[in-house]
């Protein structure tokens, strides 16, 4: 299963992008909010975290791209709501995920109905299913558009990816381990130092 793609952009058309990686062109769907934050175009190098979707009813693999693990985790929770599949969710995520998360936590059905394809009944289902589970996204993003991570945060995301996808931590748990490590040692400046501090905290 594909979790991350990095390579050269062959083309962008609407909310579809094709990335050349390892000699293979991968077509990726981008939620509107992700597409709007991407400034790169054909010929540029880019990297996306991938949600891979394939079922008996949908045998053709669908790749959905995100700027960060946090965006992908939000998406995975969002599609846990009955009647919201991955393709519908791609269309619905047309505003920053922080704003959507805040609307869910504040039981703001009206704000959710502004999402493409989301009516009153579905908005109520979203709130009933996800309220109490999305505060971390509202707090982190604060309603601001998602964008490229600052340079100093790039290695944080690398460590987060390894903790979640290779070592089996849940995303929220891994994020907390990283935050605590940085609090203990604010001078951390590399992935190696961050890994050392994370596991020093776990064993200490």
UniProtKB/Swiss-Prot annotation:
<feature type="region of interest" description="Domain III">
    <location>
        <begin position="156"/>
        <end position="204"/>
    </location>
</feature>
<dbReference type="InterPro" id="IPR012340">
    <property type="entry name" value="NA-bd_OB-fold"/>
</dbReference>
<dbReference type="InterPro" id="IPR013849">
    <property type="entry name" value="DNA_helicase_Holl-junc_RuvA_I"/>
</dbReference>
<dbReference type="GO" id="GO:0006281">
    <property type="term" value="P:DNA repair"/>
</dbReference>
<keyword id="KW-0227">DNA damage</keyword>
<comment type="similarity">
    <text>Belongs to the RuvA family.</text>
</comment>
<feature type="region of interest" description="Flexible linker">
    <location>
        <begin position="146"/>
        <end position="156"/>
    </location>
</feature>
<comment type="subunit">
    <text>Homotetramer. Forms an RuvA(8)-RuvB(12)-Holliday junction (HJ) complex. HJ DNA is sandwiched between 2 RuvA tetramers; dsDNA enters through RuvA and exits via RuvB. An RuvB hexamer assembles on each DNA strand where it exits the tetramer. Each RuvB hexamer is contacted by two RuvA subunits (via domain III) on 2 adjacent RuvB subunits; this complex drives branch migration. In the full resolvosome a probable DNA-RuvA(4)-RuvB(12)-RuvC(2) complex forms which resolves the HJ.</text>
</comment>
<dbReference type="GO" id="GO:0000400">
    <property type="term" value="F:four-way junction DNA binding"/>
</dbReference>
<dbReference type="Pfam" id="PF14520">
    <property type="entry name" value="HHH_5"/>
</dbReference>
<feature type="region of interest" description="Domain I">
    <location>
        <begin position="1"/>
        <end position="67"/>
    </location>
</feature>
<keyword id="KW-0234">DNA repair</keyword>
<dbReference type="GO" id="GO:0006310">
    <property type="term" value="P:DNA recombination"/>
</dbReference>
<comment type="function">
    <text>The RuvA-RuvB-RuvC complex processes Holliday junction (HJ) DNA during genetic recombination and DNA repair, while the RuvA-RuvB complex plays an important role in the rescue of blocked DNA replication forks via replication fork reversal (RFR). RuvA specifically binds to HJ cruciform DNA, conferring on it an open structure. The RuvB hexamer acts as an ATP-dependent pump, pulling dsDNA into and through the RuvAB complex. HJ branch migration allows RuvC to scan DNA until it finds its consensus sequence, where it cleaves and resolves the cruciform DNA.</text>
</comment>
<keyword id="KW-0238">DNA-binding</keyword>
<keyword id="KW-0963">Cytoplasm</keyword>
<dbReference type="InterPro" id="IPR010994">
    <property type="entry name" value="RuvA_2-like"/>
</dbReference>
<dbReference type="GO" id="GO:0009378">
    <property type="term" value="F:four-way junction helicase activity"/>
</dbReference>
<keyword id="KW-0233">DNA recombination</keyword>
<dbReference type="GO" id="GO:0005737">
    <property type="term" value="C:cytoplasm"/>
</dbReference>
<dbReference type="GO" id="GO:0048476">
    <property type="term" value="C:Holliday junction resolvase complex"/>
</dbReference>
<dbReference type="Pfam" id="PF01330">
    <property type="entry name" value="RuvA_N"/>
</dbReference>
<dbReference type="InterPro" id="IPR000085">
    <property type="entry name" value="RuvA"/>
</dbReference>
<feature type="region of interest" description="Domain II">
    <location>
        <begin position="68"/>
        <end position="145"/>
    </location>
</feature>
<dbReference type="GO" id="GO:0005524">
    <property type="term" value="F:ATP binding"/>
</dbReference>
<protein>
    <recommendedName>
        <fullName>Holliday junction branch migration complex subunit RuvA</fullName>
    </recommendedName>
</protein>
């Amino acid at each position: 299963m594909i979790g991350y793609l990095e390579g050269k952009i062959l083309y962008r058309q609407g909310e579809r992008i094709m990335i050349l990686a390892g000699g293979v062109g991968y077509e990726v769907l981008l939620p509107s909010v992700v597409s709007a934050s991407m400034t790169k175009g054909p010929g540029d190098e880019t990297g996306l975290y991938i949600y891979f979707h394939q079922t008996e009813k949908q045998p053709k693999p669908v790749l959905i791209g995100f700027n960060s693990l946090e965006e992908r985790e939000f998406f995975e929770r969002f599609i846990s709501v009955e009647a919201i599949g991955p393709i519908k969710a791609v269309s619905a995520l047309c505003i920053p995920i922080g704003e959507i998360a805040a609307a869910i936590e504040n039981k703001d059905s009206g704000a959710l109905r502004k999402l493409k394809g989301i009516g009153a009944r579905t908005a109520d289902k979203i709130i009933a299913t996800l309220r109490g589970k999305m505060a971390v996204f509202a707090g982190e993003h604060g309603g601001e558009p998602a964008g490229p991570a600052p340079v100093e945060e790039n290695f944080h995301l690398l460590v987060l990816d390894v903790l979640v996808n290779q070592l089996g931590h849940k995303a929220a748990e891994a994020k907390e381990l990283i935050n605590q490590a940085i609090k203990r040692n604010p001078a951390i400046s590399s992935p190696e130092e961050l890994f050392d501090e994370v596991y020093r905290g776990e064993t200490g």
